[in-house]
Amino acid sequence: MVYRLIFIFLALFCPMVLGMAPVCGQDANNGDRQYWIQTIVKIADPVINNLSKDQLKKKIPIGRSSSALASRREFVTHMESVGRTIAGIAPWLELGPDETSEGKLREKYIKMTCKALANSVDPKSDDYFNSTATRQILVNSAFLIQGLLQAPTQLWGNLDETSRERFIAQWKSTRTMKPGNNNWLLFSAMVECGLKEFGGEWNFSVVKKALDSHKAWYKGDGVYGDGAEFHLDYYNSY
C-alpha cells in the first residue's frame, strides 16, 4: 500500500521520473534537439554557473517594486530560482556524460550543479540559503527534491557527504512549517519523499494527506483545486 501511494505520487507530480526517454549517446545534431539544448543552457546557466562560483546573489539582479509584498519577496528570489532550475534540467543531467558534444556539455553541468548545490547549504557561502529564515525554504526544498529524485545518480550520487547531511537537516527543519490546506500540502509531501529516498526516515501520513486531499479537490477535465475552491494556476501541473 505504501509503495503504491508513492508510485501514484511520483506518477502524478514527477512524470519524468517514470517515463524519461533513453537517449544516452544522442548528440544534439538535429534542429529541434539542438534548439532545445541551447534553450536549456540559456535559461539555466546564469543560475547554475553563478551559484557554483558563490556569486548568485552578487551577479543576478532581481526586479524592484514599490509594493510591500514584492519587497518581501526580494529576499527569496535567488533561492526560488535554484530549485525550479534544477527541477527542470535534472532529467537531462541524469542521462550522464558521454563522448558526444551533448554528453560533454552534460558532464560540465553535472559538475557545476553539484558545486552549486554544495554552496547553497554551506553556512560559510555568500549564497547560503538559511533554512530558518523563511517559510519559502519549504517550497524551494520541494522543487529541489523533485530534481534530485529525477537525477539520483548524477546529482545526489555526486554530492559530497557533508552537503548531503546538510540537505537532510534542512529538509527536516521544514517540518515545523505547517502547510496551508492547499497546494502547499504537495510541498510537504515532496519533502517527505526526499527524506524517504535519501534519508531513510520519513512521515508517510504527510504524503497520504496530500494525495487524499487533492483527490477530493479534483474538479474534472484534469484540473485540481488549489484547496477546496477552484483556482487555476500553474500548480495544477505540479
Stretches with model-predicted labels:
Residues I6-G19:
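Bacterial N-terminal signal peptides
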Residues V17-A21, E165-I168:
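Solvent-exposed, well-ordered amphipathic alpha-helical segments
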Residues C24-E80, A87, P91, K111-A116:
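Low-complexity, Ser/Thr/Pro/Gly-enriched N-terminal "stalk/linker" regions
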